[in-house]
């Protein structure tokens, strides 16, 4: 059973959605899931898979990005449709206190171990939550190394938008043109140490005539960039159009 626990995060506005904490089990990682309180539409809620960076975990977006508060506010303001957001732990090693955990995480990243788990994770989530099966309502995004994982999983997830926030990418893993391509929604800080890599990616996408949106914002490679970008990303992917 996926609903193993419920964490209520205090917010400055009336609580609407919940953060559901899912423990690691059956070879799948721990996850935090934002679930809206609104009535589920007939075709299911839109769904976003949202990944943390190499030093974070599955609670990073809820804590530092204030996911529940942000989404509650946007839904209350009728700025976006209600959406389910899945925030998994993106590495196979779960001990935060091991001395070399950054190195083992990097090893996981290079070998694509989370990517190997993801199809099973996705099937479990979408078989347990009432989410839309239409690719136009499925999205994937990540920050820093999580952006690399999101890019690698874009085809597996069959999503319509890939969010790349301060992406740290391997050029050999750049996407290739195909008949149906997602929109690559990219944002990075003006002072980000990896800004040059973002520019290189944009030039590549231009050359390949692949759809993308690129935004530079004030800040570096940190939550001062990622937290404010999240609501803009959500308004871009699930704007409320049936007013």
Model-derived features with residue positions:
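Non-catalytic cap/lid and distal C-terminal segments of serine-dependent acyl enzymes
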Residues: 13-243
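Bacterial N-terminal signal peptides
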Residues: 1-9
């Amino acid at each position: 059973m996926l609903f193993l626990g419920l964490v209520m995060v205090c917010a400055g506005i009336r609580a609407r959605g919940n953060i559901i904490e899912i423990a690691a089990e059956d070879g799948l990682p721990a996850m935090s899931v934002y679930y809206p309180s609104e009535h589920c539409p007939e075709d299911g809620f839109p769904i976003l898979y949202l990944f943390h960076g190499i030093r974070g975990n599955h609670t990073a977006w809820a804590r530092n990005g204030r996911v529940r508060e942000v989404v509650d506010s946007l839904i209350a303001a009728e700025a976006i449709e209600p959406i389910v957001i899945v925030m998994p732990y993106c590495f196979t090693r779960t001990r935060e206190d091991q001395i070399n955990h950054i190195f083992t995480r990097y090893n996981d990243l290079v070998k694509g171990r989370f990517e190997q788990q993801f199809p099973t994770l996705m099937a479990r989530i979408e078989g347990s939550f009432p989410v839309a099966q239409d690719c136009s309502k499925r999205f994937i995004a990540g920050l820093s190394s999580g952006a690399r994982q999101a890019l690698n999983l874009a085809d597996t997830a069959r999503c319509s938008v890939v969010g790349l926030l301060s992406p740290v990418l391997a050029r050999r893993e750049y996407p290739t043109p195909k008949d149906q391509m997602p929109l690559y929604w990219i944002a990075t800080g003006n002072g980000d140490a990896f800004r040059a890599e973002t520019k290189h990616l944009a030039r590549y996408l231009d050359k390949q005539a692949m759809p993308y949106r690129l935004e530079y914002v004030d800040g570096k490679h940190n939550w001062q960039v990622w937290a404010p970008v999240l609501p803009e990303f959500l308004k871009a992917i699930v704007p409320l159009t049936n007013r």
